[in-house]
Amino acid sequence: KLKFGTSVIALPLRNPTVLAKELATIDFLSEGRCLPAVGLGTEDEAEYEACGTSKRVRVSRTEEAVEVIRLLWSQDDVSYQGKHFTLSGVTVQPKPVQNSLPPIWFGGRSEPALKRTAKLGDGWLVSQAPPEEVANSIPKIKEMALQYDNHIENDHYGAIFSYCFADTPREAEQMAEPYNLRRRRDVPMRNMNAFGPPEVLSNLLDKYIEAGATKFALRPACPPEMTYKQMEMLGNHIIPRYHKS
């Protein structure tokens, strides 16, 4: 089944009580198909200041927020005293419908991010990482997760990347350029995004699957008025190959 996800939320910028309510509501409405992922956010200090916090505390704030969210999902009348958040008798309704609570996946590809995933995460959803990097990182997470006594399911590893369909890769790359996220310059964009005919996307998906990824968040990189058409092509040419009845 398709999941209802969030890409990767910049958790230090969010109020965990409000976010717990929002995600639980999505899980309730989707009958248990909410798949949230969280991360530390960008390196831009202005984003943290705009949300009333500081980049300096983003790690501890993220770890504390995850703890608060899981408490609110699993209990009523939650009281909590932390460095960043304080709750007194707070209850969130509706509760998530997933029996074991929605899995919280972590983003990030740095060594500290992999360690954080292994320690606190239920899965890993990475962006801006080519398949070979994913293949190298998954065993690291699994090994560290054992050290933290944290069980991560084998199918809880995924990737986010952009796609744009066109007759040729060159045409697709030109169309996608203004809309594609580019946060690293050391890897060619075509190695971690899919621009061109549908087979370019299916070939990249196959490489990620071979690397150990099983869940994917695909971002159409195109003019807004073309988004529906791009998603329609995804449904017609790609989804049937991987979701056979």
Name each model feature, range by range.
Residues K1-S245:
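Active-site-adjacent structural elements that line small-molecule/cofactor binding pockets in enzymes
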